[in-house]
């Protein structure tokens, strides 16, 4: 008679080890799913009962004073503060009016809470147009602060030409401190092991503390086929300082507040966007069209002269 396989109800060490691993994994899934994740399928625009806020030490007037302190002071007695450097005060006055015009336009010219609501809806609509639908639930914007000041430019100076045939350019130092902030909530979707397996609710407030950088302004080339004014932020070969505040809340029943890794990720993404998309070309009326300049930019990107945006 051949050897028969005898099944024993007494578990072996290997069976116990495998069963223990599955038990731990099962408990971990339960804890994550029912404490931190949200399993409700109809979650569109569902918000947390708490939206984190940035606690500021300064009010709007205080922020304006901070911006004033951060900006270099103009030279006394009509003297320039450095070799061939100008204060650019006239440009700062123009920049303040330009930004204020955009703020009024975003609010449809409405004051107070009514204008705030118009700006909030516009930012929310733009955010949902840009969000990846398979990764994030619809984004709910709770509040938007468009700020009260403008970047402060100083020390306008010619940029030294590294080669005889390089284009002349003007370099500025820029410093910006304002009340700009954005408060929103959404959910991160988990599509494993099946679609919409779970949702991780996230409430987030992002606020600008201080941003400083150099700015390079390149005038148009008179003999170029499509002359444009080029603005680089930051100036090539230089660094910049970006300080932002974040307040976050993650989870459904059990909540994690102010996760450091989330702050690092947001800061890194903003820095990456500034480096990749920090070049703007201003089309001169009557000398070129936007479509022609876009074709020029594509050719420059293919030739490796510009970063791909």
UniProtKB/Swiss-Prot annotation:
Family matches, as Pfam families: MMM1 (PF10296)
InterPro entries assigned to the protein according to its UniProt record, in alphabetical order: Mmm1, MMM1_dom, SMP_LBD
Protein known as: Maintenance of mitochondrial morphology protein 1
Lineage: Eukaryota, Fungi, Dikarya, Basidiomycota, Agaricomycotina
GO BP annotations, alphabetical order: mitochondrial genome maintenance; mitochondrion-endoplasmic reticulum membrane tethering; phospholipid transport; protein insertion into mitochondrial outer membrane
Domain SMP-LTD: 84-293
Family listed: Belongs to the MMM1 family.
Organism (species): Postia placenta (strain ATCC 44394 / Madison 698-R)
Keywords: Endoplasmic reticulum, Lipid transport, Lipid-binding, Membrane, Transmembrane, Transmembrane helix, Transport
Gene Ontology terms, MF aspect: lipid binding
């Amino acid at each position: 008679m051949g050897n028969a396989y005898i099944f024993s109800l007494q578990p072996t060490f290997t069976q116990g080890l495998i069963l223990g691993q599955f038990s731990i994994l099962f408990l971990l899934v339960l804890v994550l799913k029912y404490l931190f994740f949200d399993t409700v399928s109809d979650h569109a625009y569902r918000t947390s009962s708490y939206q984190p806020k940035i606690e500021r030490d300064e009010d709007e007037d205080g922020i304006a004073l901070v911006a004033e302190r951060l900006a270099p002071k103009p030279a006394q007695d009509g003297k320039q503060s450095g070799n061939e450097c100008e204060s650019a005060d006239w440009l700062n006055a123009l920049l303040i009016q330009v930004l204020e015009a955009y703020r009024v336009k975003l609010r449809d010219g409405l004051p107070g809470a009514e204008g705030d609501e118009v700006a909030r809806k516009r930012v929310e609509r733009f955010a949902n147009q840009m969000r990846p639908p398979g990764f994030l639930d619809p984004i709910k914007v709770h509040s938007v602060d468009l700020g009260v000041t403008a970047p402060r430019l100083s020390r306008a100076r010619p940029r030294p030409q590294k080669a005889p045939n390089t284009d002349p350019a003007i370099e500025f130092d820029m410093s910006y401190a304002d009340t700009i902030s954005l408060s929103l909530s959404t959910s991160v979707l988990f599509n494993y092991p099946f679609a919409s397996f779970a949702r991780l609710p996230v409430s987030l407030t992002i606020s600008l503390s201080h941003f400083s950088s150099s700015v390079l302004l390149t005038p148009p080339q008179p003999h170029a086929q499509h002359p444009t004014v080029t603005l680089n932020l930051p100036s090539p070969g230089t660094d910049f300082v970006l300080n932002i505040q974040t307040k976050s809340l993650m989870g459904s029943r059990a909540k994690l507040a102010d996760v450091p890794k989330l702050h690092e990720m947001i800061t890194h993404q903003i820095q990456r966007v500034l480096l990749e998309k920090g070049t703007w070309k201003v089309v001169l009326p009557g000398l070129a069209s936007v479509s022609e300049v876009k074709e020029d930019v594509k050719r420059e990107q293919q030739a490796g002269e510009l970063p791909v945006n």
